[in-house]
UniProtKB/Swiss-Prot annotation:
Species assigned in the record: Leptospira interrogans serogroup Icterohaemorrhagiae serovar Lai (strain 56601)
Additional remarks: Bacitracin is thought to be involved in the inhibition of peptidoglycan synthesis by sequestering undecaprenyl diphosphate, thereby reducing the pool of lipid carrier available.
Name this protein carries in UniProt: Undecaprenyl-diphosphatase
Phylogenetic placement of the source organism: Bacteria, Pseudomonadati, Spirochaetota, Spirochaetia, Leptospirales
Function, in words: Catalyzes the dephosphorylation of undecaprenyl diphosphate (UPP). Confers resistance to bacitracin.
Entry keyword Cell membrane: yes
Enzyme class: hydrolase
Amino acid sequence: MNPYLNAFLRSIIEAITEFLPVSSTGHLFLFSSFFPFYGENVEFDDLFDIFIQSGAILSVLFLYREKFKSQIVSSFRYILKQNSDSEGFHFLIQICIGAFPILIAGFIAKKFLDTIKARPDLLEILSGAWIFGGVLILVAEWYFHQRPEEKKSIGFKDSILIGIFQCMALIPGMSRSAATIITARFLGKDTKSSAEFSFFLAVPVLLAAGIYKLIKYRSILNGNTIPVLMFGFLVSFLLCTLVIRWFLRYIQKHSFSVFGVYRILLGVGVLVLTKLI
């Protein structure tokens, strides 16, 4: 397959799945199993995924640029004691608290996770994670609707719990978005607050992973690979911006249940496919 066509299709997959609770990593692995870049160049596949995830990060920063700007400015003024409004400072602290557990867990368990990703039965593992995550989404939605009222604000304790359970995303196919949204729903948070906090947590988590992989694979950056990487980055950014806007409109009127059903059907379908191949 032409590398630019491959890059375009992967960018579409990334844009659609990164912020939806369906596992972008799982979908990208499934695609690359059939259509790898440059034959068996797994390193380039991995590096390209980081570039399109960076495009996704930029889309969050672009859409919420005013919020991030105001919260950062407010934080500095609070630290310098130029005002008494601590909202911005607390917002940034909550993001750091929520991101900290998965960054530490990912660093500690790196070799073990690399071993899992290299297993020949990875598709079966992905299938199990898709199904398990789908069931959790449906249970979380059912539990949420048993509560007397929904909550919009996410406090420090919520950030800690969401951050801890975000570590489930280290399991291939579980999904970082799913782990954070499921936890937020169990805590009684409304759909928009759950989704947006998941978006915000993505920034430090994906940024840290991106910097690490960029340093690791810097030797394969050259005149042939950089144009393809930048093409994927730009396509991902543009499409992610559209998907996030659609997603926020969708969850204003619907629950996350449809994504749970989708995950279960996908997991069962891939599991059946692996048995037939």
